[in-house]
Amino acid sequence: MIYLHSGLAQTFSPIYFLVAAGILAMFDNSKTFGFEQETESFLQGLPQYEVVHPYRVDAKGHFLSNFVSHRVSRVQRRETQGEPGNPTRVFYQLQHGGHNLHFNLTLNPHLLAPGFLTERRYGGLEGAKIHSQGPSLCHFIGDVWDLATMKGRAAISTCDGLTGLFKLSQEEFFIRPLERSSDESTAPQVHIIYKRHTSPTQSQLVQPISGDHTTNGTCGVKDPAAALERVERQRERWERRQRRKRRIRQRSISREKWVETLVVADSKMVEYHGTKGVESYVLAVMNIVSGLFLDASIGNPINIVVVRLILLEKEEEDLKITHHADNSLSSFCKWQKRLNVKGEEDAVHHDVAVLLTRKDICTAINKPCETLGLSHVAGMCQPHRSCSISEDTGLPLAFTIAHELGHK
């Protein structure tokens, strides 16, 4: 079922309003997966989306259940790897765009470091609540295909329904639930699928390779809608150059890389997504980032490993986050450097720090504008410059983060 929205002048049938109203009411009451605030305005901002009902199947495609949430305990992970029925593998099917899509997903083994910590701060380290990796894992990567024509990659979190990204026929799609899953219900859980470039941030997040390099050695992602076609041409030229470079690089020995990452969500993020939902949301976004860097098209695999997640329940006195992206980045870079453990062998030492904010940031001025992210170019090996700031725009946030990490 596909719904189109093309502005206030669009006319709709009474049936559309009844169905859409039901979906919006359900979405408004769902409080699911950190999307509490993204209700009617989110769906109205989508020019096109499709309502789908994924279901779980076995490896041969036989129906198992409409309950699609799936978590793997650390004990299960250790004891059953390599065995038939291994819970670290999970399979789904759904109808999308006239195709029967099959998902073959495997637990993302490196998204969370073995010593991963979540830290909730209430204005400083004093009184902070720190806990280690939870008892279960629910972030997966793998393949998606249609038996007739297509095959692509997917990065899906299954903590509460299916949330993530998949790519088919050079197009990228987001999937997310519209309602909370229930152990007691046998009915299918309603989800929506929408293209990356029909999301509310279409003009904002043109491509992860776009951005303006400023004289101070930073790179900012902006959203000049009028320049969309120009940036698309730049992207195509860039991809052609990268393909030529990859052909040369592939002659050398492939080297796997690891990037240990600190992720910080500011108080606006926590307020927006909810204290309970923000952790799952942030890790779902980082799972998409991980999937982007594991794509074979970039050459050598790069593992994005989250070693520490800091959730700021209250603002930090020595961390100033404003609309001014440059000043905010400068403050964050100093703040994260003080937090970092010097010894690389330490479990929570990080190579790069990522700040996620709901502030409407802007390069060079302290007022809202189109900037989505900012980072220092080539700063990975410099602790005071290995940091970035990204504005939360929903699941497309993953592409902003990936863009900024790409400049390291």
Per-segment meaning from a language model:
Residues 152-179, 277-299, 407-408:
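Classical protein tyrosine phosphatase
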Residues 142, 354, 395-408:
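Active-site recognition of the HExxH zinc-binding catalytic motif
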Residues 2-17, 21-114, 184-381, 392-396:
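Fold-level signature of zinc-dependent metallopeptidase catalytic domains
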Residues 92, 111, 118, 125-225:
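Autoinhibitory propeptides
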